[in-house]
Amino acid sequence: MARKKDVNAEIKEVANEQVKDNSYKAWNERSNEEKKASINEYSKAIIAKAIKEKATFWGKDMSKKDIDNSMPYNASKGIAYTGQTSALLRAVSELNGYEKPSFLTMKQANFLGGTLKKQLDENGKPVLTKNGKEAYEQGVKIALLKTESYVPKLDENGQTMTRAIKDQNGNQKIGKDGKPMFEIVTEKIYHKTPILETVTLYHTSQFDNLKMDKLKERDLESLEKLRDSIKKSNYDTRPNINNLGLGEKVTRDINNFLNAELKGLDYSKIQDREVTKTQTNEKEQNKSQGRGM
C-alpha cells in the first residue's frame, strides 16, 4: 500500500541541515546551550513545515471545548500536554492527519505490547538508512530539564549493589539459564545544574500490536485541577515559544493560543481581525477619495 513520505523524518532532515555547526559531537558531550540550539532548530522546523503545508492550528478561532477535545495527550497516563510540547504535537498531528492526538514513549508502547513500525516510502517500499538498514518510523523530540537521575548504588567497597528479583509470592525468580535472577539497585541523585534532555514521543498509530484496550483517554479532570492551581499561583505561568526564533506574528499567535489552552479560555485571533478591519477602512477611505476626485 502506497504511503506518503514520513513527515517526521522530513522535519528531522531539515533541522539537521539548518544547524550551523555540523561537526559531530555526542549528545552527552554537548553543553546545555548546544543541546538547546539543536532542539530549538528542530522545533522551529516543525512549525515552519506546518506553515508551509497550511496546517496551522493557531490560524483559526477555537472555543475552550474544541481546544480541550483536541489537546495532545499521553495515552498511557491520560495526561494532556501543554505549552511548547502541545504546540509541536498539535502541528505534527495536523501534518500527519492523526485522527486522535494520542502519544506514547517507546518504553510505554513496549510495555503495552507495541513494536515500532518500519518506515515506508511513497510507494510502500522500506526506507533504508545510510547504513543500508531498514529505517523505523520517526517520533517527535520533546525537550525537558532533568533535575535528578537514578544511578547504580555502590556498597562500601565501591561495588555495584544488586538484589534478588522475586515473583508475586516472594520467591526468587530463576532465569532460562537456570540461575537466580538479580537486578541492580539504584539511587536518586540531584543535579546541581539541571541537564537538558529530550524524550521522543510517538503517535499510537506508529506501533504494531499495541494493546489498544489498555490505552487511556484524555484526562480533562486533571487538566482542570492544573488550571485551578494556576489561577491561585503568583507566578507568570504563560507558556511561550519565544526561544524558537520564529516571526513576530507567528510567535504572538502561538503564544496566545497556548495561553488560552493552559488557562481554559476561548482562543480568537483578535489582533488579526484588527489588522483586517484597518485594511478595510483604508480601502473604504481610498474609494471615497477616488470618488471625490
What are these regions (language model features)?
Residues A2-G292:
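N-terminal accessory/interface modules of nucleic-acid-binding and processing proteins
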